[in-house]
Amino acid sequence: MSSARLLESQTSDEDNEDIERRPHQSHSRSCSNNTTPTHPPHPMVRKGGVARRICLIGGALFLLLVALCYLTLSGDTRLGGSEDSEEGSHHGLDSMNFRPLNETVHICSESYEDRRQFMQDKPQSDYVQLPVIYFVTPTYPRREQIPELTRLAHTLLHIPRLHWLVADDQEKCNDYMDTLLYRFGMPFTHMVSPMPSKFRNEKPAPRGVANRRAALQWIRQHNLTNGILYFGDDDNTYDLRLFSEIRKTQRVSMFPVGLIADYGVSGPVVRKGKVVAFLDSWVAGRRWPVDMAGFAVNLEYMAQYPYVNMPYKPGYEEDLFLRSIGLQMNLIEPRGNNCTEILVWHTQTKSKKLGMVRLESKYLDDRSNLGALLHNLKLMGVTSTTESEGRNALISKNGRENPHSKILS
């Protein structure tokens, strides 16, 4: 019962009690004008009033106890309705109305046209009945960004009925990336969704969360309930069989991921065809200790949970996302031959700082290919040119290094 109803019931009972008291009060006033001494109320009247008070207090305590039990036992699937306030503060949601806080999403470009003629030696028409895989890739500007997206794209080019959601962690759209994604010929959406500034100074920073949240928002805005959601980082390595496996997902499917932490693997423990536990070297109280690449979700199932989201809490993104969709152990579908095969690897490219070439701007004209080449590399975020910093550009000929001015002048 709500507190408003409880207050209403208490007020109405007290009013009834006042009505019962009024005859005695008026009798006392009328007797005060006479010399005849007044008599106290009948003992049964006093007992009745006390009994009512006891019943009211007991009822209120009982309702309070029921409410506390309900709040304790009920599993709130909304991120922001968390088990403790500290955890809730990391969700990036307004605790009052569960709206995203200070998040920006901008669609740079998208295409729903599949310009690939053949996939796996079959025409597109052979695949029209397959559910679409929405492959979400968070990415961020760095020297390796374009090479890794290019490598990933040449895996995805083999997969029919796939829409690639590329979410970049920066403020402005990258025109070069727009051109690159369009050139691949598969359906895609390119969006920018920078991490809110309040989380950027955290160590470790919740990298990729704003991008995945942006993709979830895009799916929600398009009312997509038919298809499969998969979070695929740009530096992972994917077996083509993975996509056939996750396309069969009815609710939530799971499978092991290779090269994770100390064990070299993270994934479900399966007995008699059912997931019963998890193997992972970092549990840390997580109900679902799995890697982001180790599960897929059916959009029809996810649509049952309007508060689905992902928290800004490093290490707990997967766990709290899966909690937000009400996942239970008996709903998990093991894939990869009962989780005995590795279909995705958590490979990581060694990152280096932005390259720097010291070269006067006058040599970046059309006298050689270097002007256009270095311009393209700058657009990719791989290297940059400067006239005052970095190592002076050397050009070799016949095994000998020469100042660039000697060759280009």
Curated annotation (Swiss-Prot):
Q: Which GO terms describe its molecular function?
A: asioloorosomucoid beta-1,3-glucuronosyltransferase activity; galactosyl beta-1,3 N-acetylgalactosamine beta-1,3-glucuronosyltransferase activity; galactosylgalactosylxylosylprotein 3-beta-glucuronosyltransferase activity; glucuronosyltransferase activity; metal ion binding; N-acetyllactosamine beta-1,3-glucuronosyltransferase activity
In which broad location class does this protein mainly occur, judging by the first location in its UniProt entry?
A: Golgi
**Sequence positions bearing Phosphoserine:** 9, 12, 32
Spans through the membrane: 54-73
| Membrane-related topology note | Single-pass type II membrane protein
Instruction: Report the record's Gene Ontology biological process terms.
Output: carbohydrate metabolic process; chondroitin sulfate proteoglycan biosynthetic process; glycoprotein biosynthetic process; glycosphingolipid biosynthetic process; protein N-linked glycosylation; proteoglycan biosynthetic process
Pfam families linked: Glyco_transf_43
User: For bias kind Basic and acidic residues, which ranges apply?
Assistant: 398-409
Question: Where on the chain is Phosphothreonine found, per UniProt?
Answer: 11
What InterPro entries does this protein map onto? Glyco_trans_43 (IPR005027), Nucleotide-diphossugar_trans (IPR029044)
What are the entry keywords? Glycoprotein, Golgi apparatus, Manganese, Membrane, Metal-binding, Phosphoprotein, Signal-anchor, Transferase, Transmembrane, Transmembrane helix
Q: Which reaction does it catalyse?
A: 3-O-(beta-D-galactosyl-(1->3)-beta-D-galactosyl-(1->4)-beta-D-xylosyl)-L-seryl-[protein] + UDP-alpha-D-glucuronate = 3-O-(beta-D-GlcA-(1->3)-beta-D-Gal-(1->3)-beta-D-Gal-(1->4)-beta-D-Xyl)-L-seryl-[protein] + UDP + H(+)
Q: Where does Mn(2+) bind?
A: 235
Q: Which GO terms describe its cellular component?
A: Golgi membrane
Q: Where in the cell is it found?
A: Golgi apparatus membrane
Q: Where is this region: Disordered?
A: 1-45, 389-409
Instruction: Please report which protein family the annotation says this sequence is part of.
Output: Belongs to the glycosyltransferase 43 family.
Its function, per the record, reads: Involved in the biosynthesis of L2/HNK-1 carbohydrate epitope on both glycolipids and glycoproteins. Enzyme has a broad specificity.
Name of this protein = Galactosylgalactosylxylosylprotein 3-beta-glucuronosyltransferase S
Q: Which gene encodes it?
A: GlcAT-S
